[in-house]
Amino acid sequence: MRKLLFLATVVYTILLIIRPQEFVPGFEQIPLLQIVLLTAFGLWLFCGDKGVDLPQFKILPLLLVFIWLSLGIGGGWWGGIVSALEKMLPPMLLLVIVSGSVRSLSALKVYSFILIACAATLVYHGHLQVTTGLGWTGEPMIEGRITYSGIFNDPNDMGLLFVLAIGLCILHLRTQQGRFMRLLAWTTLGWLLYGVYLTDSRGTMLATLTVLALEIWARFGKGAVITLGVIAVPVLIAYTRLAELDAEDESAEGRIDAWYEGVQLLTQYPLFGVGWQMFSDHNSLTAHNSMVLAMAELGVLGYTVWLSLVFLSGWMIWRLAYPAGLLPQPYPPRAVTVRKETPAALPSPPEAAILPGFDAAAERLAARSLLFAACGFAVGAFFLSQSYKPMLFLNCGLIAGRYLGMREAGLRVPAYAFGANLPRVLGYALASIVGMWLLVRILL
């Protein structure tokens, strides 16, 4: 059943990114995305260990509740839950099916290959836009920046797909043994970096630099990172919009004004926010910051739930990439005491022998690639509005799948409880609100 789920997840990912149903004649009226997604979710329901004890599966329905409350209390539109479900269920279900299907290292490599190929295809579409003026989707460029159809019509959103693909491409560089495959990985990495350049997205460029810096630091040390910065930053400033990244730039000034408006809205609607996707009713620009958008629209309570998804996913992949006492169980299995993250953490799964052929070093290398890609996404999301978009949930789904895969292999992984960590996340949420307020006060 899991193989069928993996196949359905791959098909859905291709349809979501490449979107042939939107430009291939005869498919426009067929809801292929919805059909494949529901099929994948149905297959997930019949899989064995779904991993529903993970905090992500408790956060998702709770996030929907607070979205509804924000619409009703803050926005005065209780019926908006229908629209919210239509837009939020697909990315949430993407997290679910990815976490259920992309668990083994081999599955991650295949799925990452699909993601990289899809991203490279979008780069080629952008290249056609630059050279001929139009790609096969018929979408035009926006102010000299490449676009695509559907959810990647915005070059900023497309750029964050490239960031994830770059992180996964580096994973293939680190694990491939054949000369041809390594050459292919290097070529693809260069092609994806070309795509980042074509997006001309400053947030994407900073995110890409973050991924590259972390990878270089992990392999060569901080001296190499400093060298990279000395070389790369002046080049980017000279040839991209990074030269305009200051508070006096009109675009940057608009972002800061949007951040200020978001903080002000939070003070006016502190508990439940102004209402999901209602920020634009109060400001001409979107927040251009995922945290500000979530805190303004969902209030402190909903923002804390949203931040729980981000924080616990990040903490989870951090501990997998850089484990403390993360060791394979001896064979035959014996009872051990699992180190817990909090006093009220979930109980550990039944002990199991390590799976045959399990390569702990390769697994941790994969976890580090996902961690670095997630860090890059976080940097980009700080300057872009990604609070409810598919790329956030895809990153969290890959992290959850990595955790479940290593747990199934018999590794002692820390248990994570949403409720036990909620006070900590609430503290982080309040600290981030104060931090954004101080940042805006400094920049204005």
Identify the function of each model-found stretch.
Residues 16-23, 137-151, 272-296:
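Juxtamembrane membrane-water interface segments that cap and precede transmembrane helices
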Residues 27-34, 83-84, 150-162, 200-203, ...:
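Membrane-interface micro-motifs in multi-pass membrane enzymes
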Residues 252-308:
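TM-adjacent membrane-interface loops and short helices in multi-pass inner/ER membrane proteins
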Residues 1-72, 79, 83, 106-109, ...:
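Transmembrane signal-anchor hairpin modules in multi-pass inner-membrane enzymes, especially those
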Residues 67-72, 93, 109-143, 150-218, ...:
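Alpha-helical transmembrane segments of multi-pass inner-membrane proteins
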